[in-house]
């Protein structure tokens, strides 16, 4: 079919849902009131920690995050707040700033917001004990350290693997333990401590298999029958 120019350039949202289906928003400092006020809850969110490999939908490509970012969770079919049946946002009146600024026909406002400060966990969390535990996790399980030990596998072999497994175990067991001790919901852990390293380790070409006795086995991911 021959493409014909649109004689009337779009000037308003037609609720096609493409932006909601494509990806979920990252929160900015402007979104603090919605999070503190409860319109957007911790269980709606997850944190991308500094150094975590992410896809940049604006600049393109995959690269380590240069700063912490808080994102709205995705679900099958787009953003967790998007209701496909109604083609609408369930928190529209309190939607994130990125959503409010995004106009697919004119991205100037969105790009201005994109360059503004991102919301950080320390902006939201007032519990000093919890903030201290987040800092301790970052010291022990930073992506910079994980990336370094992954690179050292080729030279140090099992020694580097054991250190990586220790990092994964600490991060894995920290979550249910603190959920119980601090009265937090398990669904909130990805906001407070980022996604589990046992899941994000795949970005390094590795995967974790949980053993029957409770231990972890670290292996390389096979693609098309070839080990990466």
Task: Walk through the language-model features, giving the residues of each.
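Hydrophobic scaffolds flanking metal-cofactor catalytic centers in soluble metalloenzymes
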Residues: 1-228
